[in-house]
Amino acid sequence: TPDYEHYDDNDMLDANTPVDKTSNTLRVPDILALVIFAVVFLVGVLGNALVVWVTAFEAKRTINAIWFLNLAVADFLSCLALPILFTSIVQHHHWPFGGAACRILPSLILLNMYASILLLATISADRFLLVFNPIWCQNFRGAGLAWIACAVAWGLALLLTIPSFLYRVVREEYFPPKVLCGVDHGHDKRRERAVAIVRLVLGFVWPLLTLTICYTFLLLRTWSRRATRSTKTLKVVVAVVASFFIFWLPYQVTGMMMSFLEPSSPTFLLLKKLDSLCISFAYINCCINPIIYVVAGQGFQGRLRKSLPSLLRNVLTEESVVRESKSFTRSTVDTMAQKT
């Protein structure tokens, strides 16, 4: 169910769908979206469920596990909602779940997707502070503050989702006969554009800037220390930032363009046909995070020697981060002692 859905007479005259709905023919973008949804569902549910299981036992004693637990929960819940999108696309975007479900289910999908983005930005900021302000982290960084930061991320994600919940409605069509579920701003283009701009800035630009700035400074700090200079660090940085940018950019750009275009324009109609594919592309980010941190954090031989839960526990817990923080703390203290 596209979040930037517009109702107009063009929806009622779709030449690709017969009146009796007997044809199983789907557009190529919809077929590609279904394939992506299927892969993301299988990988995302299993991968994030494993991460939740591993980090749930560690969250009481390690802050890093709190970050990844919340991130995995957001991605896991997003993946669980995929059969809903899958069913709607298979039925030529017919919505068989009713009006209440039209408001709640797509809004929950958006809530979890934006929570995933904001939590990823929070994790990046935390790693930045660990490296550049380790003394403050040792004095004030605790589980309570981590849970508060996660609550703020979830709260902001909820605010970003409210417009979708308020303006999402169902509409019955007759040629072909089907029910559509989408966002209807009542032809108020200013409100629609304002919602799109706020969502773009808070849900994409700001997290992207946070990721880019944090990992750029972390990369510079790492490369300035000759003992830790390696191409692996560069690959981790490129993977995290590039995956976020690549998978979310089409969804955000098409949504912004559709909010500024007239529903009858050829460009709008083309973007509307690609909307499901853009959503599925953004969904890849829900299953890619566990893969990035596991594959980038360990060598191939190490992955073969360890069981997957054990490997995830080593990657997602606090040990390596704490050691890095303590190392910088000792270095800072030694430097201060030499100056006095």
Swiss-Prot record:
Transmembrane stretches, by residue range?
31-57, 63-86, 104-125, 147-167, 194-219, 236-258, 276-296
Q: State whether it acts alone or in a complex, and with which partners, per the record.
A: Homodimer. May also form higher-order oligomers. Interacts (when phosphorylated) with ARRB1 and ARRB2; the interaction is associated with internalization of C5aR. Interacts (via N-terminal domain) with S.aureus chemotaxis inhibitory protein (CHIPS); the interaction blocks the receptor and may thus inhibit the immune response.
- Which loops or segments lie on the Extracellular side of the membrane, by the record? 1-30, 87-103, 168-193, 259-275
Asked whether the keyword ATP-binding is assigned, the reply is no
Q: How is it modified after translation?
A: Sulfation plays a critical role in the association of C5aR with C5a, but no significant role in the ability of the receptor to transduce a signal and mobilize calcium in response to a small peptide agonist. Sulfation at Tyr-7 is important for CHIPS binding.
Report the domain of life of the source organism.
Answer: Eukaryota
What's an example of a GO molecular-function annotation for this chain? complement component C5a receptor activity
This protein's GO cellular component annotations are: apical part of cell; basolateral plasma membrane; cytoplasmic vesicle
This chain belongs to the protein called C5a anaphylatoxin chemotactic receptor 1
- Compartment annotation: Cell membrane; Cytoplasmic vesicle
The UniProt function text for this chain reads: Receptor for the chemotactic and inflammatory peptide anaphylatoxin C5a. The ligand interacts with at least two sites on the receptor: a high-affinity site on the extracellular N-terminus, and a second site in the transmembrane region which activates downstream signaling events. Receptor activation stimulates chemotaxis, granule enzyme release, intracellular calcium release and superoxide anion production.
CDD domains associated with the record: 7tmA_C5aR
Please give the residue ranges for the topological domain Cytoplasmic. 58-62, 126-146, 220-235, 297-340
Could you list this entry's UniProt keywords, alphabetically sorted: Cell membrane, Chemotaxis, Cytoplasmic vesicle, Disulfide bond, G-protein coupled receptor, Membrane, Phosphoprotein, Receptor, Sulfation, Transducer, Transmembrane, Transmembrane helix
One biological process term in Gene Ontology: chemotaxis
Sites bearing Phosphoserine, chain numbering: S307, S310, S320, S325, S327, S331
Sulfotyrosine occurs at which residues?
Answer: Y4, Y7
Recorded hits in PANTHER family, A to Z, give: C5A ANAPHYLATOXIN CHEMOTACTIC RECEPTOR 1, CHEMOTACTIC RECEPTOR
Q: Which InterPro entries match?
A: Anphylx_rcpt_C3a/C5a1-2, Formyl_rcpt-rel, GPCR_Rhodpsn, GPCR_Rhodpsn_7TM
Q: Pfam families from the entry?
A: 7tm_1
Which residues are connected by disulfide bridges in this protein? C102-C181
Q: Where is this region: Involved in C5a binding?
A: 14-23
